[in-house]
From Swiss-Prot:
Pfam families linked to this entry: Ribosomal_L6
Keywords for the protein's UniProt record, in alphabetical order: Ribonucleoprotein, Ribosomal protein, RNA-binding, rRNA-binding
Protein name: Large ribosomal subunit protein uL6
Family that this chain belongs to: Belongs to the universal ribosomal protein uL6 family.
Taxonomic source organism: Clostridium botulinum (strain Loch Maree / Type A3)
Organism lineage: Bacteria, Bacillati, Bacillota, Clostridia, Eubacteriales
Gene label: rplF
Amino acid sequence: MSRVGKLPVAIPNGVTVTVTPDNVVTVKGSKGELVKAMSNKINIAVEDNSVVVTRDNDHKDVRALHGLTRALINNMVTGVNEGYVKTLELIGVGYRAQLQGKKLVLSLGFSHPVEMEAVSGVEFEVEGGTKVKVKGIDKELVGAVAADIRKWRKPEPYKGKGIKYENEVIRRKEGKTGKK
């Protein structure tokens, strides 16, 4: 039995979960609605105030899907209830972020500003010009958009300049010592 998969997903007040016979899970909450198609090898049932995920057999691929399905449903329930936030920090001289409508404009030392359009389901928030918050209800989408922003200038190990996640620790390297 999967250690993750055997735990039921608690459904908080204000959140409704429905499962169709072909394993399409719909989660509605105060922040929005998420719909995701799950594998037919897994059984999903809504009982009382929880979602129970079970499997029919112990094949390796089904065991792997068991924990995955439970985790995905848990992420959906948390997303529509609380939402997800990824915070990015811009470190470097002249590195700035600003919002123009729903568009995020980054000055990252290139000859041109980097413009990113907000994907549906994700919104940006800029604090002090050097902190960007990516908010949304879909954990996967929030993480993907944050990774897209970060890839423009990954933190470099010598001075630590670049775009990093809020609690990310950058391994620093020693520079060259030179001749004496």
